């Protein structure tokens, strides 16, 4: 009984939040209509009332949402931890049948999702054989359980911090293969099922697409490319009843493991760096490694705590008339991105650097770089 009350209260709160704008407008309009009536504008009041009713109806119509049922399947790519893991749990709580792909089939994320009733399959989006097996498994599951494919969520991503010249060819290639080509490949392989079920495609984008930042040039490029691809795909698939949406979930690096291997990435950069570059960057590289390694510790596997992420995500998943982009951003991000957009480059570049707050550059060759692994912080502490 308490669980039922909790669910009902939660739904009521969500309903009030979603329609709070129209409630406020209608209340203001009602007060205005009473004022007009008292002032003697009796013929104007019916016309204004009809306009208010029509506007309220259209607003509620636009804001209306579909319902989720157990025979609705949602595919989420990249669910080992972080956002993918959290969205898989949330979609399961909504009542959907969730199909989650993981890189590590025996990892803690896969095991916990399996305990929650999520269908977990192994998938490396850069491996064509894996893709084929995953698609066959999804097709079999949909047919066996008579499921309707409701949505594909492209979430798999790799982010490597480090200036562009430092990153190895393998690191750059990995980000391109997972973030951009991986999403394109899995979507293409699932497209026949997506068309048949008039499904929805949600692409996880990033604020780095809106404003690329130093240190993640390749990552920003993959997210910008992914968004451009999704925009064109949205226009192509609209006539088939397939909706394509970009979802920007916001920043939660400290709650995610997306940077857990950053120390090893820095070591690879140092090992492959030419001698000239080592002397040029010197202590700047070491300071950079220490700074960003401090925020790249592996975190405990937990569901993301920001409730706003799930509120915005539900709009992308359930709105009958969805927007092209859904963003979860704090007032700080909103102000920064507005300033980035309206200020000249000389000022916006300064704001971006202040926003990132990386270690300062003190000139070339300030100190010869320590070529040993001791130059990097010990991640075991």
Describe each PLM feature range.
Residues 115-129:
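Rossmann-fold cofactor-recognition segment
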Residues 155-160:
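Conserved NAD(P)H cofactor-binding loop of Rossmann-fold oxidoreductase domains
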Residues 163-164, 168-173:
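Substrate-binding pocket helix/loop in short-chain dehydrogenase/reductase
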Residues 187, 222-225:
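Active-site helix of classical SDR
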């Amino acid at each position: 009984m308490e669980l039922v009350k909790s669910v009902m209260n939660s739904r009521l709160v969500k309903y009030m939040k979603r329609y709070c704008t129209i409630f406020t407008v209608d209340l203001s309009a009602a007060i205005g209509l009473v004022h007009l009536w008292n002032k003697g504008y009796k013929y104007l009041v019916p016309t204004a009332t009809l306009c208010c009713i029509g506007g309220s109806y259209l607003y509620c119509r636009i804001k209306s949402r579909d319902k989720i049922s157990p025979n609705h399947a949602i595919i989420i790519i990249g669910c080992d931890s972080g956002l993918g893991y959290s969205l898989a749990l949330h979609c399961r709580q909504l009542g959907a049948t969730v199909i989650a792909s993981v890189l590590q089939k025996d990892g803690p994320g896969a095991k916990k999702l399996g305990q929650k009733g999520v269908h977990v399959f192994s998938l490396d989006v850069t491996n064509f054989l894996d893709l084929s097996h995953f698609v066959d498994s999804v097709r079999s599951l949909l047919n066996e359980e008579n499921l309707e494919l409701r949505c594909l969520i492209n979430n798999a991503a790799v982010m490597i911090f480090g200036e562009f010249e430092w990153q190895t060819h393998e690191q750059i290639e990995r980000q391109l293969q997972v973030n951009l080509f991986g999403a394109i490949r899995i979507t293409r392989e699932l497209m026949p099922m997506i068309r048949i079920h008039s499904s929805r495609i949600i692409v996880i984008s990033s604020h780095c697409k809106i404003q690329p930042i130093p240190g993640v040039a390749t990552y920003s490029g993959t997210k910008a490319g992914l968004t451009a691809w999704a925009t064109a795909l949205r226009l192509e698939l609209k006539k088939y009843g397939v909706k394509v949406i970009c979802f920007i979930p916001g920043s939660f690096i400290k709650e995610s493991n997306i940077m857990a291997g950053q120390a090893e990435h820095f070591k690879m950069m140092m090992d492959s760096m030419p001698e000239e570059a080592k002397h040029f960057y010197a202590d700047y590289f070491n300071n950079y490694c220490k700074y960003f390694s401090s925020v790249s510790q592996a975190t405990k596997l937990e569901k993301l705590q920001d409730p706003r992420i799930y509120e915005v995500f539900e709009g992308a998943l359930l709105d009958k008339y969805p927007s092209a982009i859904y963003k979860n951003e704090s007032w700080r991000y909103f102000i920064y991105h507005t300033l980035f957009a309206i200020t000249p480059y000389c000022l916006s570049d300064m704001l971006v650097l202040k926003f990132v707050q990386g270690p300062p550059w003190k000139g070339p060759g300030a100190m010869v770089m320590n070529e040993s692994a001791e130059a990097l912080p010990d991640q075991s502490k």
